[in-house]
Amino acid sequence: MSEAGTPAEALTYEQAIANLRQTADTGDRYYAAWWLGRFRMKQPEAIALLIEALDDSLDRAPDGGYPLRRNAARALGKLESPEAIAPLIACLQCEDYYVREAATQSLGELQATVAVPALLKLLEGGPEAIAAIPGKPHLTQPADAVMETLGQLRATVAVPVVQAFLEHPIDKIRLAAARSLYQLTGDDHYAERVVQGLSDPKLQRRRSALMDLGAIGYLPAAPQIAQTLAENSLKLISLKGLLDTHLRQQTPEAIAELDESAIALMDLMDGLL
């Protein structure tokens, strides 16, 4: 919310720029960075100010982190600007875990293959180095985000590094490794490991598996997705991810006709509405 309590849509581009430029109110700056990304404001001025915000040291969280840097990093991933890639790579060395995580995800959105060496550095030491930190809600590195981004970037050089994380003691790390390896190798064996998450006793893990399968577009998982004990809204999102991936792989003529797989997917989606 802005200072006046107006909804997001009521903030203008000019107000967002002014709020991000000033330094007296950190809350307004934080919100402005989010707003610029949320509404895809790709003007050079907005991008330049968001890049500048990646070095902000005025807005500090109780945990010592940098909230404005986090929002700026997230926003830049949505703005399709190559200028943001080098500054985001630099953010991978920030002491704030959440800045590293946001930068990692944005580099994936930007398809920044040049970031692969820096991303691999975050996984140095293997599974043993990615561990819990006493008193913190996160691990030493955002390994799940790193592996997912490596998968997005089709960084096949990362395969042996990521394979080691299939044996990590934390479920979400193993799931991220399997998702990444399917994207990197196309081997169904890895996708089936993600499918197993649909029957996990914990709802959050089932939700994660749904989102992962939608992201990788693993078509054989469609029936299991539809039957998963989770919200229909999430199952629909996952199935739409499968359908989108399937259609991208078809010729325009095939899309016009709709093959059996596409029709079956749409039938499953109709059943969830």
Swiss-Prot record:
Which InterPro entries does the annotation name? ARM-like, ARM-type_fold, PBS_lyase_HEAT
CC per GO annotation: phycobilisome
Task: Supply the Pfam families for this chain.
Answer: HEAT_2, HEAT_PBS
Can the keyword Lyase be found in this entry's annotation?
yes
Q: What are the UniProt keywords, alphabetically? A: Antenna complex, Lyase, Phycobilisome
Entry superkingdom: Bacteria
Q: Does the keyword Lyase apply?
A: yes
One of the record's GO molecular function terms: lyase activity
Principal EC category = lyase
EC number(s) recorded for this UniProt protein: 4.-.-.-
Q: Quaternary arrangement and interactors, per the entry?
A: CpcE and CpcF associate to form a lyase.
Per its UniProt record, what PANTHER family does this chain match? DEOXYHYPUSINE HYDROXYLASE, PBS LYASE HEAT-LIKE PROTEIN
In the record, the note on similarity to other proteins reads: Belongs to the CpcE/RpcE/PecE family.
Q: What does this protein do?
A: Required for the chromophorylation of the cpcA gene product.
Name the chain's protein: Phycocyanobilin lyase subunit alpha
